[in-house]
UniProtKB/Swiss-Prot annotation:
InterPro entries: Vps53 (IPR039766), Vps53_C (IPR031745), Vps53_C_sf (IPR038260), Vps53_N (IPR007234). Pfam families: VPS53_C, Vps53_N. The gene is vps53. The keyword Secreted does not apply. It comes from Schizosaccharomyces pombe (strain 972 / ATCC 24843). This is Vacuolar protein sorting-associated protein 53.
Amino acid sequence: MSNGNDNSLIIKNIGNNEFKFVETLHELLPEDITYDDLGSLRLSLSERLQESVKKLDANKKTYEDAKLSMGEKMDDLNSSIVSLLQELSTLQSVAENTQSSIVQMTSEIKNLDFAKQNLATSMTMLKRLQMLVTAYEKLRTLRQNQKFGEAISLMQATLQLLNFFKKYRSVERIASLSRSISEFQKSFYEQVFDTFQSQFKKESGMRGGFSPSSVQYLNELCRFIDIFAGDPPESVIRWYCRHQLEDFMKVFRENEEAGSLENLPRRYTWFKKLLQTYDQLHKPIFPPHWKVDFRLYEVFCEETKNDLSKLLKDDRLSLQVFVASLEQTLEFESFIDHRFYNTKSRFNSNFEPKERQAYNALSSVFEPHYTLYFNQQSQEFSILFENFALEKQTSTDESSQVLSSSIKLFQAYRKTLTQFVRLTRSSPLVGLKNLFIKWLRRYTQVELLDYQESSTFKDIAIRLNTAEYIYRTTIELEKRFQEISNKEFKDKMSFSEVLEVISSSRGTLLKFATGKFENVLNSDLEPLSKMDLKNIETVGDQSSYVGGAVQNMTAKASEFLSVVDLNMFARNFCDRSCESFTRQFLNAIYLAKPISEVGAEQLLLDLYSFKNALLKLPDLKQDYSITDSYINHLTIFMGYIETVLKTLLTPASPKAGFIQSYIFLVKDRSVTNFTVLLELKGVGKSDISSFLQQFSDFVKKTPQLEESSPIFKYLTINTAVEQAATRSRLSLDLAPESSRTLQNLGRLFTSKKKHV
């Protein structure tokens, strides 16, 4: 019963969207279905099919009815669209007619506006034309009566009216009137200019000078002339300047003595009097914006520059006259600067370039001729260096930490710069900088690096201090040059090239100091190289040479460290001393070979004394204490020597023990280095090949070894030893792993060559 209800539910779900055919079929036809159940299932499916057919018929009928209704509605819609289009066409026709009417009305209004505007313009033009004609007639009357003051405002109005009628020049009467007025203005201007010249000359020649009425009259003439140009009229100003300087030109150009550089102050005094005359008599005549006094200075400047250019090219010119003339010129420019720019300093960098060019025009003529100054200064520096050489021979100052000559050199530099900056701060300052660089280079070569092998450690330390002093002072000098120079030259005030030379000299001096110290170590360790370290039987106290060597080494280091200023130099010297000692000690024991186990133990004891002495090196400089980095540095290099000596402590027999000790301590695979240790150990040449064979076997089993230990960079290896090691290494590469004699290896190598 239950099964029938389930089937009914399943059959009802057959039409669903999520209907699953396979699963539904399995549910309707389970494995345990009976024949009776099939009949019932068939009946249910038939009923379901009939229901579906009925629903389908109903849906078809509904669709047909809807389709019929939709057709009727489409007919109505098409009819409505046709009607709407007809109405739109009618509206468009009405709109076009309306637009045409509006355009016609607007056009009529515009025509009325244009007519009104043209009428107003015509009235204005006729009125202004009447004004122009009236002004023209009145100006002609004023010209005849020479009433120039009254004509000023009327002429201004006439010029404005003429400017208005420029666009109407196509009208013949207006064009003719404009030409007549322009010709009148030109002739009127020339008449006023001529009147100004004659009146000015007349008043200048009178004993009483310019009367108030004549000043007013001349001022009216200038104001009339000023109307014709927005800028100051060049012709009037130029005439005035030439007129005022006429006597000046005659005196200083026609008379050779008056025009010489020695009489340059007279030129400047004369011009100052001209300016004084201008201030007292002529200033009220000219409009202020003409700046006639400055233009007078410009013309004077132009003429004086031409004269100075010729005078400065004279080969007979002395430095004394050159400097005196330049100083007088600078003093005059300072006066001009104060008058026209109202500044306290002649070197005010806020001036515009054009203004600087104007007030600095005279002194700039001297700039190409500063070679005369530089040559003289170079001679003075040459004499100074000769004195340095004499002082070097007679110097007895034991307390100085730097060469006194370096202080004197920079004192001379400061004195020269102080004098020079009063003369110029422009391009010649670059020449002075180059001169200073030249002599700084010379000083570095002659005073710092011109040392002898006989130079003491104190001498070297003083030179090193001097190099540092020069380096720091040159940087300050560079800053000073940049501060005082004009801003367009600041980028050219670099001392970098000579600073590199000085910096390089510090490194050279340090290298020389450590090289000299290494020579001391070489002499002190010479007894070690001659010791019999093979037959020594017992280890006692330190060897006899150690005390003297330590004492001498400490004394020489103290001689340098107690004088050198910078801790950086002291640290560098101490670091290099460790390296030098390592090199000399290893080379000494190499010369003292062979070394027995007892000999190696004795050397370790001796090394301890040297290590303590090297550890105390930084204490030899005042206010400088030992650092952890120096201790680490010393430990590394003493470790190199200790590694060699500890390897030599191992007996040569058994061979494997010595080889293992080498690999454990030295940690490299170099046949050359191992051969050196065998040499130091005193292994006979006949036994070396067997050592090398076993060494090769051990190396193959220890791939993590270095190619070569850094220890052997500090040991000078005999060329013969190196060649023997190379031959042995070649033999080992060709030999089989089994032990063979060198003769068999040689025959094998020969047979292989023939076979090839």
